[in-house]
Amino acid sequence: MRKTYINGLGCISVQETFDTIFLEKAEINENDTILPVKTPVYKDFISPVAIRRMAKGVKNGIVASAMAMKEANVSTVDAIITGTGMGCIEDSEKFLKAIIDNKEEFLTPTSFIQSTHNTVGAQIALGLQCKAYNLTYVNGSISFESALLDAKMKIEEEEANIILVGGIDENADYTTSLFKLAGFIKRENEGPYKVLNATTKGAVYGEGATFFVLENEKKSTTYAEILDVEIINKLDVNEVESKCSAFLEANGLQVSDIDTIVLGFNGDVEFDPYYKILSENSFKNTPQAFYKQLSGEYNTASAFGLWVGAKIIKTQEVPEIISVNNLEKPAYKTILLYNQYKGIDHSFTLISKC
């Protein structure tokens, strides 16, 4: 069975994760409940004519994918697989608002055409003139992991050699207001909004696009090997440790073999115990990292988490800004990532140095 290597990365997020090495310009914002994306210079990647018609999620996805392909030194791919929770929600809102404002008459189709969840994958394919396998997974907070698992299986089964995989989500005003009403987002005027040891419900929300070029061959640009991905729909808090141990054992590993665990803490006091049980028990003597204090919470934030894990292996450091317990190891070879959202859609991802 062939191996799967991460050979290129591209990340557009609420931090300056482009034109940097690894979070040296990152800042923690504990005052706002919604974190806007930091945008690159779009016209360096997309023609100004096309930019006008694109929502930010589409633009960010195109730029992040271009960065990943440039780093991996590839010009075409055998498959494009994306994951998104809310899709191009900004254009969906525009179209629905136009229906109401115009009383269902004289509607322009642009926002409707651009509002589908697979718009990002389609626009990337159009730009590359790529007519290969193109699939978008819309599966809540495991949308990205579903795409990653599909890509890994295609490489293992020798159905593709080079695959572009990404996770994309964007914020939109009306949807955000609904999330606030539902209690998904932290209440205003309750800051500072700390992620670790939080005492309130909800999370600080963000947005972003993170892409990876996966190949079956190791290259000079290789970050890490993807060893395994597992998705579990529902778990009780007291089941997490046993499921984690079983996942490691299936890969011939033990807790002591993990050099860093990357956890998806988001500051929701109701559901962060899923992470705490690993942090305070099985992995209490293991270096721990967290990332949603930088990225914010969104359906495909775990793609940002994988970007963090890959960078740790490449740079052989865990920056202080993402360290949970300030423990260190002389080398970071094997990293475990764990994420969940509101107690469902749990994922374990295992990567290693090649």
Regions found by a protein language model. Give the residues of each.
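Alpha-to-beta junction loops
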Residues: 159-161
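Catalytic nucleophile serine of serine hydrolases
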Residues: 140-143
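Conserved "HGTGT" condensation-loop signature of ketosynthase/thiolase-family condensing enzymes
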Residues: 1-135, 145-149, 153-157, 168-354
